[in-house]
Amino acid sequence: LSPMPSTYTPRVQLPSAQIASTQLREVTDMSVLQEISPNVKNIKQSEYEVLASRASQIEKELSQGVRKPYKELIDVCWCDPHSVGVKPLTFVRQVLAACVYPQLMKSHELPLDVRQRAQWLLGRCDGGSVGMGCMCVKVSEFTTRRDGGVPSYPENIFISTGSQWAIMVDILNVLVNSEASPKTGVLTPAPCHVTSMMSITALGAAAVPYYLTEEQGWTLQVEELQRALESAKGVCNPVALYVINPGNPAGLVQSRKSMQEVIRFASEKRLFLLADEVYQDFVYGENREFVSYKRVLAEMGPPYSDTVELVSFHSTSKGFMGECGMRGGYVELVNLDPAVQKHIFKLISKSSCTPVLAQMALDLMVNPPQPGDPSYPLYNQQTQHIKNMLAQNVKTTHEVLNSLPGVISQPVEGGAFVFPRVFLPPKAIQKAEEEGMQPDTFYCVRLLEETGVLCCPGSEFEQKEGTYHIRFCITASQDIVKEVLRHLTTFHTKFMKDFS
């Protein structure tokens, strides 16, 4: 439909008094706000909304020729690598293009393995609410390889519309009893990405924060888990423990020892373990490697390997794929009570299946080109380039941030973000309060206004009270990361001077 012209007027116009009366009646009779779910009303307003609104205005002003100290915005709030200079993987885009437009398979310009994969995928589009049957098998084979032979079973895997949808809609919907008193609780890391916190609240549950130890590289301490659990007494009934490994926004990568401690804690306290592992491709720290919770659980042996209930998540949006728009992911269930698993699959089955193109992208993630395939040399070259680029970005970012006065950045061992602490001057904190903002939101708004760089404030992520942080994406091209750091250095120096 074409948009209405700006001069459009309705054919029948009501007198202004009648309009006012009608509007008043709609408010009083319908009581819209009173009818909205209290769980939805309890969702904390995002700090990012202030920044997003202003960024939208700035983009409009730039397009209208308004003069500013910069020509365009640089949005490094989110992990969307293809929007910040990282090229998509050729193999992935070629196969998806051939699936969408099969005529391309008649062209010999596409490598043979691309055409064969597209043909194979198109021949298996039979649907199914838990995903294409073959896709669950492919994911199962992938996790078995990844975990050093720890067996995986297709019947314990379902395909989802992204990892966040799977965690918050499919899994927590089963775990959370919205009518319980006290309400259901979920232990969540702090800092933690805001979508998880909002979703937990929307379901009528309580997020119980456990604070990662920033001074020790954002490590997860079992003593802190115990403190968080005790703090929930009389407030809620914790049933699940949510972990993010590698971290977001904090860039920790858990060691085997740390994961074993978490598993023992979950076992002792009878907590359902939710492992968000979407950044498993991105590990940079020395002597660090990604090991899945499923693998560590299996290696611990009985009784843990037989009893701890675990759900793990992965996504095509993250890692080398970076296909954020596909919204494809998977969930693997381990040791679930058959009665619980039945309800999870019942909930999934009531929904339409994940978009077929997203499922195809998932196949390309878990089953990439192998040595000897025509597409392998280029695929290997591109993924290696991304690895090297990110390693350099991490090194450069760490050096620059820690050279700035009043900034401390812990080493980034994995994930897609850097989350430095900013020690803001008292005058800046006072000014932020006068303007009705959190101090680090105020900092980010000023950064946006003066440099065109869009970062997220730490207050978006449940940081420890009295501390201030910013988060920005490092899964960008080296040129963009350097540009962000250049702007940030200039801005921060001036900001600290202005408010000293």
State where each predicted segment sits.
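PLP-dependent class I/II
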Residues: P3-S500
